[in-house]
Amino acid sequence: MGQIQYSEKYFDDTFEYRHVVLPPEVAKLLPKNRLLSENEWRAIGVQQSRGWVHYAVHRPEPHIMLFRRPLNYQQQQENQAQNMLVK
């Protein structure tokens, strides 16, 4: 069975992005014409930290999943957790 491949992260002014390349045997599990929820993409074996959203399908290559999350997402989560500990 092939391995799921993860790109390096890339950025714009608002989001950080990454793409995930699925092997054929996993790609065939993808539903047609819709995006996956976090629970769904985790269920097919995609592993990444919290906050990533499957935001687009690259029609010419549907085995490539496109993800994004807000810039500084992890830092915001750590700050919220720290604030809860202080209260």
From Swiss-Prot:
Other observations noted: Plants overexpressing CKS1 show reduced leaf size and root growth rates resulting from an increase of the cell-cycle duration with an equal extension of both G1 and G2 phases and a shortening of the meristem.
Gene3D superfamilies referenced in this protein's UniProt entry, alphabetically: Cyclin-dependent kinase, regulatory subunit
Gene Ontology terms, MF aspect: cyclin-dependent protein serine/threonine kinase regulator activity
Keyword Ribosomal protein listed: no
Family per similarity comment: Belongs to the CKS family.
Function text: Associates with cyclin-dependent kinases (CDKs) and plays an essential role in the regulation of the cell cycle that affects plant growth rate. May inhibit both the G1/S and G2/M phases.
Keyword Cell cycle: yes
UniProt keyword annotations, A-Z: Cell cycle, Cell division
UniProt xrefs under InterPro entries: Cyclin-dep_kinase_reg-sub, Cyclin-dep_kinase_reg-sub_sf
UniProt subunit comment: Interacts with CDKA-1. Interacts with CDKB1-1, CDKB1-2 and CDKB2-1. Interacts with CYCD2-1 and At4g14310.
GN (gene name): CKS1
GO CC list: cytoplasm; peroxisome
SUPFAM superfamilies attached to this UniProt entry: Cell cycle regulatory proteins (SSF55637)
Organism this protein belongs to: Arabidopsis thaliana (Mouse-ear cress)
Name of the protein in question: Cyclin-dependent kinases regulatory subunit 1
